[in-house]
């Protein structure tokens, strides 16, 4: 019974982030087929980089908790864990914004203003009121 209640029909399946971005680039920015192909290639490279970073984050989190446990959650161990986590978050943010810049570099001069004004809306669109 629980499976039936919580199973979503295929027609309402969520669109992947990649597909949403492709639609944005095609419909809002005006990408052509060659530009979309460049984006696809860039996406694959970015996805591999993010996977490596996420694996590193998981390993780092495990290590942080081990160090915290072994030290009895000392102030210095907590500070070290915070510093490691912050550095990993900086790397993730850097990868994200570098990818946006690389996508922007695929745009021609006419498309760049549309990308610049639309990208924030793409990532931070307001929820519709119910």
What kind of region is each of these model predictions?
Residues 17-84:
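Extracytoplasmic/periplasmic/luminal assembly and interaction segments
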Residues 1-2, 30-32, 37, 108, ...:
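Proteins with a high burden of low-complexity, intrinsically disordered sequence enriched in S/T/G/P/A and R
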Residues 10-15, 51-55, 87-92:
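A short, ordered amphipathic alpha-helix with a cationic face
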């Amino acid at each position: 019974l629980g499976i039936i209640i919580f199973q979503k029909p295929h027609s309402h399946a969520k669109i992947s982030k990649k597909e949403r971005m492709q639609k944005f680039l095609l419909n809002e920015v005006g990408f052509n087929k060659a530009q979309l192909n460049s984006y696809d290639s860039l996406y694959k490279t970015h996805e591999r980089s993010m996977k490596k970073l996420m694996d590193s984050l998981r390993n780092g989190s495990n290590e942080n908790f081990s160090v915290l446990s072994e030290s009895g959650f000392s102030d210095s161990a907590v500070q070290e864990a915070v510093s490691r986590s912050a550095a990993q978050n900086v790397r993730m943010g850097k990868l994200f914004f570098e990818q946006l810049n690389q996508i922007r570099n695929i745009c021609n001069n006419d498309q760049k203003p549309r990308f610049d004004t639309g990208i924030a809306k793409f990532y931070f669109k307001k929820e519709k009121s119910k």
